[in-house]
Amino acid sequence: MSEEKQKFHSIIKKYVNDVPYVSSGEKGVPELEIRFGTYGNKRTTRIDYDNVCKNLLSHGFKPTSKLGKSILRVTNSYIDRNTGQTRMSSNIRTEITGIDLIKQYCKTNILPESKDYFIQQKKHASKDDNTSLFPENIDAYNLRIAYSRENTIYKDSKMGLSIIDSWNDTKKAFRYINRTTFVHPDFPFNIDCSIVKSSKKTKNNFTFAYTVQEANLFNNPETYEIEIEVDNSKTEGYTTEKLENAIMKCVKYILAGLQQTNYPVSYTELKDVGSSYLALIKNTSDYLKPNTFIGPNSFTLQKQNIVVTTKTTNIPNINDDYSVTDKADGLRKLLYIHKDGSIYLINTNMNIEFTGCKSENNKYFNTIIDGEHISHDKTGKFINLYACFDVYFINNKDVRANEFIKKTQDPEDKKIYRLQLLNNTINELMLVGITGKTPPLKIMAKRFYASNDSSSIFMACSQILDLAYNDGFEYETDGLIFTPCKYGVGLTKQNTQLRSSKTSWEYSFKWKPSKYNTIDFYITTKKQENGEEVIKTVFETGTNTTSSDNILQYKVIILRVGFDEKKDGYINPCLDVINDNIPKISNIDDVDSYKPTPFYPTNPYDPNAN
């Protein structure tokens, strides 16, 4: 048993030994919590939060409330007599529950009636030798396990009266929580998924304020917390092993949501896979980031890339030795076969997903393939298909410089082409599943059609479009992808250097029917003069203060598109002349002129569209 697992086991064992005998009293109510993403590898995002909730629902968990539970937690500060500094009473907090009571407090910053709030003190549980049992971080799963004791502080006690009497004169830290609790009849605990707004932090310490308004609480960014809390009333009959197994089962459900796979693995393993990937592509980055995705982006096909021309030009043209395949309605991901044969998918944000598959052919270990991950077919049935369209590395060897497709039957042609290598790899992969011989992921190579002396690229396109129209694909397609036959990955006539980072390939094109065309907007939030975001409410003419509905707030965003004055002209040249905003010839080429600019459609023109 590893050191981390031993620590995890010992805390659960201590809790199981204590809970039947001590439910309350001076030592307090036992509380065993497991929190995710609060320390270490990766913070929890809104997408993570949503994915975990979906995964819990799919495993039979039910929310106790559809709207969630609203909680305002207030922690008072005190002056450290030794240093004179303001410090937070980390183990004592006041809690107000319910949106109506929270609204009331936010208006007045005065505690409600005595029965409508409570004060809690939380302390670390004690080991058998009466020393504190501190929380333990389990880095392998990016979680923290803590066993503590909670006591309610009576409001007429000395400590309670002190907190209440000094309330208005004491600075505080605030946390507003909207918590959705999931429960399952087979598990003795609650899984809490929380959206949190907190007082601002400076160097990981809360900034204290007297009021909610001074703390600017509701304008601060949201954070997301996921935790398992054992229900003491449901643990009867649970041994340490039984409770640990139940917890680990739910840890798996949560990690499956966070990693977007039915086969979650430890973050230690994911880190090792990421390091191996970077070493293979010879990228010197310390960690994975979006620009380490080596699959090149394609350009949108333009008229200049289609029109037949007799002029000598450097503009790539699909009439000149190109191949075409379908563009699937799936997610672009790299398929990476690790040094032990385990197969992972890596998306464009460099998030790694274990597929639950392995290759038993060591000839293809340390291989990188590019393709599209298609989860459902046209009818909505789950197919879990990976459709490959290129290969970059095979068994540690970089094959990106190879030409793509063989167009002739010339026996003298001894070149090795990437499409040939890709097909051989897929056919010889010897794919198996880790839980059985049937692999959960289906892997196929896409079919490419190339232009030749008897068939133009447009005839090749027609073949694919006819197949799509006649249901020749089990999955949805939304266009075509054009790949040059004679060039290595990312290479052009002028650029012959392979790159180990993200790039756009000006010889690779994508085309979509008009009904599938989209515009990618870059958004920024509208700011006030002081730089803070503009936040408005849905109802500005007044609100019903007797209602328990949450006040709906929104931010104003500005839609922006990429604009380059060197290529696209000037946004408003007449106004530039009036304002004497004339670019200097000496520095016009030294400035990065590609920038996000507010979107102004020209047909029809609408100055307020952004």
Give the predicted meaning of each segment.
Residues 1-283:
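Phosphate-end processing signature that detects enzymes handling 5′-triphosphorylated RNA
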Residues 16-20, 166-168, 178, 195-201, ...:
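Eukaryotic intrinsically disordered and solvent-exposed regulatory patches
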Residues 24-28, 32-37, 111, 123-134, ...:
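Nucleic-acid 5′ end/cap handling module spanning
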Residues 37-39, 122, 183-185, 194-196, ...:
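Structured beta-strand/turn binding interfaces of compact recognition modules in eukaryotic regulators
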Residues 44, 191-193, 201-203, 236-239, ...:
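Short helix/loop capping segments that flank catalytic or ligand/cofactor-binding pockets
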Residues 131-132, 167-184, 200-281, 376-410, ...:
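Intrinsically disordered, low-complexity regulatory tails
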Residues 339-378:
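Conserved loop->alpha-helix
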Residues 363, 371-372, 376-389, 394-452, ...:
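Eukaryotic endomembrane system proteins
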